[in-house]
Amino acid sequence: MTLKEAMKSIKPASQALRRQAKRRWDQVAKPLGSLGVLEEDIIRIAAASGSLAVSLHPRAIVVMCGDNGIVKEGVTQTGQEVTAIVAGNMAQGNSCVCLMARQAGADVIPVDVGMACCDAVPGVVNRKVAYGTKDFLEAPAMTREETVKAMEAGADMAVELKERGYVLAGSGEMGIGNTTTSSALLSVLLDMDPERVTGRGAGLTTAGYNRKVQVIREGIRIHRPSGEDPVDALSKVGGLDLAALTGFYIGCAACGLPVVLDGLITGAAALAAVRISPDVKEYLLASHVSAEPAGAMVLDALGLKPAISAGMCLGEGTGAAALLPLLDMAASVYTRMSSFDEIHVDAYEHLV
């Protein structure tokens, strides 16, 4: 699916189904709105999927994997070889997201869109666009053509999920250095100084953190990415994993597939997707608010409320995995609980 085809296929989520799902919640024999954000999540799923009868199975978490040339600048504790190692663990079902997803009844699909390793990793879907990005202090991270190609690889994964019968998606990422690229992207899209949106990632020292902020600030100064053109921003200071996630969200919206975000990095890509095609927002669900400094900022920019505030910042799609059991519980209440009429009790009324 080309990016233009995906964007053209996106339709706004059904407002009629939103109203019907809200009405169903109001009929359930419990205090109005008492399941909080979980009620809104079920409403969003009904509207996005086009069905009042909410179905949450089967489901899969797609993890976009790619390496970032910016690691050369000392912005991480580990080398980029770790990306392929963790992706391989995902393929074997041994990574953190895999163990959590197994408990949540979800498949995990790791996708190589830009790992630096030359050899294919067994069990990892190969959609490689390039062998990592460039160091954005030396050159733009990607060409615009590479960025679009990665976005289209992401959109194709959404189509594949839909064709395989999945009704709910989750999103994750793996790429050493991608808290740097996502912070750079958010600095551009939110028009904020890098220091405000940059955290310590996987545990940088104060000196390392200061270096990270300096690198982002310098990369933005050199390339002047446009906050009005997310593809330009992705190309100049982003990453292949971020671009693929951006396309994945656009593809999910095009397919009518609700998709759960993880944390900061998936949120940055989601913001890029929404800036490209605003209707994508209606297909997104926030899982948790990341402990990274910009975690709350990106959700505010998206207008999404997370159900979980647990100080998480692991990545991989673990936040999406954590939300799924909560959605199951909420869907059970939505679907099976008696109505006020059925138990012969006067319904609650909304206070004006």
Task: Map each language-model feature to its residues.
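N-terminal loops that bind phosphate or other acidic moieties
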Residues: 2-352
